[in-house]
Amino acid sequence: MMHIKDHQLQILPFAPAHLDGGERLEQLCFVHPWQRADLETQLTNPCARFLVAVLGDKVVGYLGVQVVCGEGSVTNVAVDPTYRRRGIARALFGACFAAGELDFLTLEVRPSNEAALALYRELGFQPVGRRRDFYTEPTEDALLLTKTFKKEEPDG
């Protein structure tokens, strides 16, 4: 467990109690935020793997991944700007990786988001493509990154 200013950072599965915090992070972090209803649908989506980072009683980050047959796609990563560069996104991804259900994980990132790019490279993501004009406000390409997980072969 990680400590930030005398509080333990907990990585937990997204639950109804986290909706207010998730909605707040969406508003803080994104030009086109998901609405509360979008977050609520993730609670019952069998393919959704949403994790929240909770510090004290405050949701300070979350990671959303859609998983189908071992193939993961990151839908959202958000960390409260006040708590960035403290290892929260790394902890969220670490918990996601530790679940062990992924063959690979793909995400998109703005080329201008240098901090996120540096983190993703450190976590083992490799560039695999580019989506032209993917983002708006401002218009920008998305870099497509993938991390492949090695699975142990069964004996036999």
Please state what every model-predicted region is:
Residues 79-81, 85-98, 114-122:
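Conserved acetyl-CoA-binding loop-helix of GNAT-fold acetyltransferases
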Residues 52, 58-66, 71-78:
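Conserved beta-strand in the GNAT
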Residues 14, 77-79, 109:
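Hydrophobic adenine-recognition pocket in adenosine-nucleotide-binding enzymes
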Residues 50-54, 108:
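Cytosolic beta-strand hydrophobic patch enriched in CBS
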Residues 32-41:
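A short, aromatic/hydrophobic, helix- or strand-capping loop or linear motif
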Residues 3-6, 106, 110-114, 123, ...:
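C-terminal "cap" of GNAT-fold acetyltransferases
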Residues 7-21:
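A short beta-loop-alpha structural element at the N-terminal edge
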Residues 25-27, 43, 92-103:
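Alpha-helix C-terminal capping segments
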